[in-house]
């Protein structure tokens, strides 16, 4: 299937202002003063495009084989930036659902691995509920893969091994950021980075922070979606009841 070229849209950075305490940031895009810049309801409703006819008659019996194939094709597509980017959704306190984009860093031991701060908002949500979902939205290929499953921490050894492969600046950033905690100013963050940089200069071994490491999602469902003409999309879903049972592949109505 020929890739679909999406125009690059440049966005001006909205002006920022701080209150006297320097803690609260407010943004004003000017929409309220210039309502013509905003999209009308009719304009939003009119946003649609026709999908192609690159359908999928079947998939391999093993979902990981299928995923590796699709990920490889996405990575080779010049119009997809970071094919390993996935939307992670978690359920936290008061059943609050939150989503954010993280990067897939490994597919092994029957699961999908990502790394983060263990004191972050997502980590606290995972502590409360180990059911999560992942979404790989490969728009340029009219494809997506959605995954739901059980998440748990990987071993410290695995986290150490991956952390050692990260660029020095990313390693220092893991020490500098108290992820998801209130921040008085950008300068405070930069100061923490400078302090960590002085402690571990570039070229030295930076130890992994105890509060940083990996999680692995063991899937219960993996749905492969391919856009088709007339909204007659293809949906093939692998499902199992337990993380150690066999997958069953079923086609669903779009």
Regions flagged by a language model, labelled:
Residues 7-8, 37:
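Short helix-onset patch at the extreme N-terminus, typifying the N->h transition
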Residues 24-254:
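Binding-site signature for planar aromatic cofactors or substrates
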């Amino acid at each position: 299937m020929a890739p679909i070229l999406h125009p690059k849209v440049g966005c001006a950075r909205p002006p920022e202002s701080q209150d006297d305490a320097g803690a609260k940031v407010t943004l004003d895009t000017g929409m309220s003063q210039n309502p013509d810049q905003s999209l009308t309801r009719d304009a939003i409703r009119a946003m649609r495009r026709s999908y192609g006819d690159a359908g999928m008659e079947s998939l391999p019996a093993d979902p990981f084989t299928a995923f590796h194939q699709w990920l490889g094709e996405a990575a080779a597509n010049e119009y997809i930036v970071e094919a390993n980017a996935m939307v992670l959704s978690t359920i936290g306190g008061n059943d609050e659902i939150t989503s954010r984009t993280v990067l897939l860093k490994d597919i092994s031991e029957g699961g999908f691995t990502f790394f983060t701060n263990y004191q972050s908002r997502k980590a606290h949500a995972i502590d409360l509920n180990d059911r999560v979902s992942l979404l790989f939205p490969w728009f340029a290929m009219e494809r997506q893969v959605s995954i739901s499953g059980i998440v748990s921490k990987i071993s410290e050894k695995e986290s150490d091994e991956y952390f050692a492969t990260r660029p020095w600046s990313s390693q220092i950033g893991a020490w500098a950021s108290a992820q998801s905690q209130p921040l008085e100013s950008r300068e405070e963050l930069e100061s923490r980075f400078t302090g960590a940089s002085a402690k571990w200069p570039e070229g030295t071994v930076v130890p992994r922070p105890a509060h940083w490491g990996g999680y692995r999602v063991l899937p219960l469902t993996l749905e492969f979606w391919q856009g088709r003409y007339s909204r007659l999309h293809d949906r093939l879903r692998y499902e199992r009841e337990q993380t150690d049972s066999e997958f069953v592949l079923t086609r669903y109505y779009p």
